[in-house]
Amino acid sequence: MRHPDFPSAVAVPPAWQASLRLRFAARGERTVLAARQHRGPLMVQKPLYPEGDICHAVILHPPAGVAGGDTLDIALHAEAGTHAVIATPGATKWYKSLGRDASQHVRLTVEEGARLDWLPQENIVFDDARARIATELSIAPGGSAIGWDAVVLGRQASGEQWNRGVLWLDTQVRCNGHALWIEQSQLDAGSPLRGAVAGLDGMSVLGTLWAVGHGATQELAESLAERLPYAAGLRAGVTCLSSPAQSMLLVRVLGRQMEAVRHVMVDAWSALREPIHGVPARPLRLWAT
């Protein structure tokens, strides 16, 4: 018989249901944040212009982490003639789930003649987390976009391993409704793929960068491949995908340390930005802090 003062189940804290909608429009040569709407703990800082007319915006999530039951829904729309750069100030931490899934769904829409850089910092998956991370890019012919995602399995800074939990990754890139690239995966903490040579090969950091636009050619892929590492603890490769309406480059990175993977991805973005967007790369100030 249970004593009424000692409940049989652990109390589960309430979950956050947060959303953010941003729309970028052209005002002459300048890109402005024309509309914003948020619910819950997702918001955006005042736009900055370190590159002249290009609009830089930083998305904030004050709780700093995503717990079981939380949902984050982010939608960005870049109208024709705009160029927006979106970043986050720190890593997204996926906490122990207490049995509930946590999710983040990002929807990016890029119109004809628009340019977008989607450059969030990494996701850190804590032990016993159940994380669903989805990114959808819908891009029109004549638009261009470069973006990335990186995941760290376990808390490297504290030596914590990822021994329990599940990670779902869903990335889709479409042009005029037609799929350029769709990848959906589920990784269990105990999966043999984590140690398999054809899987993660014992690595705990994985990154993906995509670059979409008419400049994403096979020649550019071959040029980029020459500067990508391939060693025991850090390896990367690039693939060119094309359709009649659009083409894209896909860069994959596997490593043991986030800092090394980040360096590869920033270097790839720096090499791709001018061929894809027609704009030279300038490192974000956030990366120096």
Curated annotation (Swiss-Prot):
Localization (cell): Cytoplasm
InterPro entries: UreD
Cytoplasm found in the keyword field: yes
Recorded superkingdom: Bacteria
GO molecular function list: nickel cation binding
Stretches of the chain forming a coiled coil according to its record: none
Keywords (A to Z) from UniProt: Chaperone, Cytoplasm, Nickel insertion
A GO CC term attached to the entry: cytoplasm
Family: Belongs to the UreD family.
Oligomeric form and interacting partners: UreD, UreF and UreG form a complex that acts as a GTP-hydrolysis-dependent molecular chaperone, activating the urease apoprotein by helping to assemble the nickel containing metallocenter of UreC. The UreE protein probably delivers the nickel.
Function statement: Required for maturation of urease via the functional incorporation of the urease nickel metallocenter.
Identification of the protein by name: Urease accessory protein UreD
Organism this protein belongs to: Cupriavidus pinatubonensis (strain JMP 134 / LMG 1197) (Cupriavidus necator (strain JMP 134))
Gene behind the chain: ureD
